Amino acid sequence: MHATTQPFRPIQPLSDQLISQIAAGEVVERPSAVVKELLENALDAGATAITVRLEQGGVKRIAITDNGRGITPEQLPLALARHATSKINSLNELENVGTLGFRGEALASIASVAQLTLTSRTADAQHAWEISGVQGSDQKNTVAPSSGAPGTTVDVQDLYFNTPARRKFLKTEQTEFGHCAEVVRRIALSRPDVAFSLSHNGKTVDHWAVNDIAKRSAHILGSEFSGARLPLEETAGPLHLHGFIGLPTASKARGDAQYFYVNGRFVRDKLLMHAVRSAYQDVLHGDRYPSYVISLDLDPALVDVNVHPSKIEVRFRDSRSVHQFVFHAVSRALAQTSATAFGAVPSPTPAPSGALPWLREQQQTTFAPQFQQQYGVAQTTANYGALFNTDGAVTPLGTEPAPAFAAFTNSPAQTMSDDEFPLGFALAQLHGIFILAQNTKGLVLVDMHAAHERILYEQLKNALDDNAMQVQPLLIPITFYADDVEVGTAEDSKETLLSLGFDIAVMSPTTLAIRAVPTLLKNADAQSLARDVLRDVREYGGSRVLVERRNELLGTLACHTAVRANRMLTGPEMNALLRQMEATERADQCNHGRPTWVQLGLSDLDKLFERGR
């Protein structure tokens, strides 16, 4: 394969036409890029209603009409000139830009690869004026009278007609239309105060009337999202975060329902996406993606939007503080799902006669001291005590097989109001798997293993975060056969194991002895726990397992210890589990994002039995 050689040429300036076409390679990547640039111009012009008409996926025609301020006839030629704009006039304005567009190259770039006609009318003009984008050094753009309502229409036809090589890289009509429609949806989500209409090949595809973000997001993301979303509203100094995040149960197999905006601009920023993903990390499977519509507003001087040709990436002046703010805001919203559904979390109340005591301890911890000092905000999280005992240990549960339906009549529900306890009071245990409880809304079904697993997981996290992992020494050490790798891991990672609450000693080249386990896990299979911990520490390294794999490891430990199916619980034990669920953050989902309980309201039960028909 031989390299091609170019004839020797002297250095010379490029023509305006070629310069614009080179710029178009970055700005006009595909039809959807044209739609994006024109929609942003319409919004910058103050439009409150925008119509988008497409033909053949936008390749044959893209026509966007708005009711914005319009352009005077004297300014129309400048609108098609390269690097001409009304949005900035100095470096200071560029660094504080508040508009979506600012480079002044979009229309010129589009006109260099398509037939473009710009029609505009200001509110005080008697009629509209139009100009056609004519490329070529010997031709001038002429302004002519036209008809039209106040506002602007940009009509782009025959995209890439003069650059056939670019057309070859386009996909099918439906694919290109899909990209265009997604751009319209993104921008429509950012501006619910603006009406949008989208048509393709003469048929109306969608219309979004002026509305609030709740209804606009429900329209675009669908009923699945609107029925499983949490409101998000946080402010810290110059940072304001608002929008909606989906519950883990509304996660998707693809990340196509993730919309993040910075000062009204849709972005795909790695820092922000990582912050949101980290907040979901212990309530969502690794192969699932959360759904959300989040907007971050801040001083334009604190963010640089001029770092990517399509302005889809941004750079923050204090990226660490922004990351921490977004992460903790989303984490708190997810942690308050119970409170969102049922109201305030109940305060500690003495257990009724015959029931086991339960404990709720709240410790205040402040995150990111440097962030607090800079923005004057202190954020707190709640840490809770043990599930059944005040000493932090898990109460042993019955080991005998449970009957298919175990019920009890001496229920505290007879003497206490459901209003104080969102999850109500236990009625029965079903097949040794589910707890049936009654609250003021109707029937509550609890997956007892998933719920208990979540409670233990949160307790283990809190203990590890506070360096307060309580250890239960074993009266008689448990010895087991170990291979060379396990023995080596126990020797090399003793400090890591101790920090996790495990004291594992090497007795011989083939024998390990478990001398202590975490108090929270004292009723689990110690040998199985030890092998799992040794495997993870060996695979990821002692230091990494406590940072990168901490949540996965603690989730495994919690799963081993949580109450299993066919374990019969007494009435007080079931109620104690319900009370601790109410006092535990993120208790609505297990560690894998599945629901731990569901509510069947009285109306739902009426429908099942066709009552009232």
From Swiss-Prot:
Purpose: This protein is involved in the repair of mismatches in DNA. It is required for dam-dependent methyl-directed DNA mismatch repair. May act as a 'molecular matchmaker', a protein that promotes the formation of a stable complex between two or more DNA-binding proteins in an ATP-dependent manner without itself being part of a final effector complex.
GO molecular function list: ATP binding; ATP hydrolysis activity; ATP-dependent DNA damage sensor activity; mismatched DNA binding
Biological process, per Gene Ontology: mismatch repair
GO cellular component, one term: mismatch repair complex
Keywords: DNA damage, DNA repair
InterPro entries: DNA_mismatch_repair_CS, DNA_mismatch_repair_MutL, DNA_mismatch_S5_2-like, HATPase_C_sf, MutL/Mlh/PMS, MutL/Mlh/Pms-like, MutL_C, MutL_C_dimsub
Name this polypeptide is given: DNA mismatch repair protein MutL
Stated family: Belongs to the DNA mismatch repair MutL/HexB family.
Transmembrane in keyword set: no
DNA repair in keyword set: yes
